[in-house]
A protein has these predicted regions:
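Catalytic cores of the polymerase beta-like nucleotidyltransferase superfamily
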Residues: 1-456
Length: 456
């Protein structure tokens, strides 16, 4: 099959829109004699004049050859062997072109996919036509093997190949089809819609971890409400999140209201805002009978300090925090949340319950701002309608408290006495203290007598 090729003059994608680190990888691959294409959703989003979440690269170089080219490269994955080329905190993903893998005997699901192939074979093993577009750095052309350009113009999500077969190979693709259509404002083509309804029960064969990961992506994409509504309409939600399916079926709007608030925040803050899994889990509480407002108002126990502080001062009650963790982990839910995320949410609730109080002393407010999860708890309160003036006041409290906080300094590796490591640990100093002045340490003198542990 001859691909459709759009020359540089026939499309709007420019190198200036591509991440500089991704360009470096593309040019280095080309300079070493390999093909280097920008692939997948990055090409799609740039053609739609949207900001890509990431820039993925396809190449005919093997993972080992890529690793030899880049010292900062790490090979990861089992099902897919991928190369992560690191530039500080940024990662550029490089994948070798693959051809379609066959499922293991007696199974319809492809569990390993490391059979290398050509660019054309790689395009046809991808999920949707709009995700199978390649941008060639050699001549700046866009290569389309599957009809993705036509579907992009028609605002259509179409499966590559037979939808029945492709959804049986990887049932999570059904969730992805719904999520992509909702995020881009596209329609799923009729054949794929019918296939999803026919094979929706196959989703239970997928890893629960992959399903949960897809839900996290949906919650982060800025169109979570619409996506959950469509998952419910297509019948998928009954299998992946039965509690939410039942809530929506009986007309409970709690979940949709929390997702509306989340989407509004994502659109206001942009795609760069990072939300932890714990914050995302909080938006799934309403179908479980736990309104978000309950978790963040008055669940922690107020307990005065016993020292010289005023009557409005408090600390988080460890027993209360422990109770929150127990409540959270005993929730009957079909999604396998990581315990660390559930415990993080419990601590967020304990901190967040104080944010609506108006009787706290300045000292108590300052102490609260020192809590590890204060910023996340404040963020969650902001997402769900906390008064902007109150949010601003709490941020001012946190900034002032941080400015007045004791500073940690580290002495030189080799101090004046010439003994490296004698100042291996930082010292906590009060504001205005001189770091050069060290406290005098006295050695305790041991009384004369027999060695410890010896018989007398």
């Amino acid at each position: 099959m001859q691909p459709r090729i759009l020359a540089r003059s026939q499309h709007t994608l420019s190198r200036k829109q591509i991440d500089p680190e991704a360009l470096r990888v593309l040019y280095k691959l080309r300079g070493a004699g390999f093909k280097g294409f920008l692939v997948g959703g990055g090409v799609r989003d740039l053609l739609l004049e949207r900001k890509p979440k990431d820039f993925d690269i396809g190449t005919d170089a093997s993972p080992q050859q890529v690793k030899k080219l880049f010292r900062n490269c790490f090979i990861i994955g089992r099902r897919f062997r991928l190369c992560h080329v690191r530039f500080g905190n940024k990662v550029v993903e490089v994948a070798t072109f693959r051809r379609k893998a066959e499922p293991e005997e007696g199974d319809t699901i492809v569990k390993r996919d490391n059979t290398f192939g050509t660019p054309e074979e790689d395009a046809f093993r991808r999920d949707f036509t709009i995700n199978a577009l390649f941008y060639d750095i050699a001549d700046f052309a866009i290569i389309d093997y599957t009809g993705g350009i036509e579907d992009l113009e028609a605002k259509r999500v179409r499966v590559i190949g037979n939808p029945d077969d492709r959804f049986r190979e990887d049932p999570v693709r059904m969730m992805r089809a719904v999520a992509i259509a909702c995020r881009l404002g596209f329609e799923i083509d009729r054949e794929a819609q019918e296939s999803i309804r026919a094979h929706r029960g196959e989703i239970v064969k997928s890893s629960h971890v992959r399903i949960l990961d897809e839900i996290y992506k949906i919650l982060r994409q800025g169109s979570a409400r619409l996506t959950f509504e469509q998952l419910h309409k297509m019948g998928l939600l009954a299998y992946i999140f039965p509690e939410a399916h039942k809530a929506l079926s009986r007309g409970d709007k709690g979940l949709l209201e929390t997702l509306t608030s989340l989407d509004a925040y994502r659109k206001k803050s942009g795609s760069d805002a990072v939300l932890s899994n714990a914050v995302l889990i909080a938006h799934l509480l309403p179908p479980l009978g736990i309104p978000l407002s309950v978790g963040f108002r008055g669940r922690a126990t107020r307990r005065p300090f016993v020292d010289e502080q005023g009557p409005g001062d408090f600390e988080l009650d460890p027993e209360d925090v422990r109770e929150e963790v127990d409540i959270a982990t005993e929730i009957p839910i079909s999604l396998p949340f990581a315990r660390r995320d559930v415990e993080r949410l419990s601590l967020l609730a304990a901190v967040g319950s104080k944010l609506h109080r108006t009787d706290l002393s300045p000292h108590a407010e300052r102490n609260l701002s020192y809590k590890p999860y204060f910023q996340e708890a404040l963020l969650l309160a902001e997402i769900h309608g906390m008064d902007p003036d109150a949010v601003g006041r709490w941020r001012s409290v946190a900034q002032s408290a941080e400015a007045a906080r004791p500073v940690e300094t580290r002495a030189p590796d080799v101090p004046a006495d010439g003994k490296p490591g004698s100042e291996a640990h930082p010292r906590r100093l009060s504001p205005g203290a001189d770091p050069a002045k060290r406290p005098v340490r006295r050695r305790s003198r041991r009384r004369a007598g027999p060695p410890r542990g010896s018989a007398v």
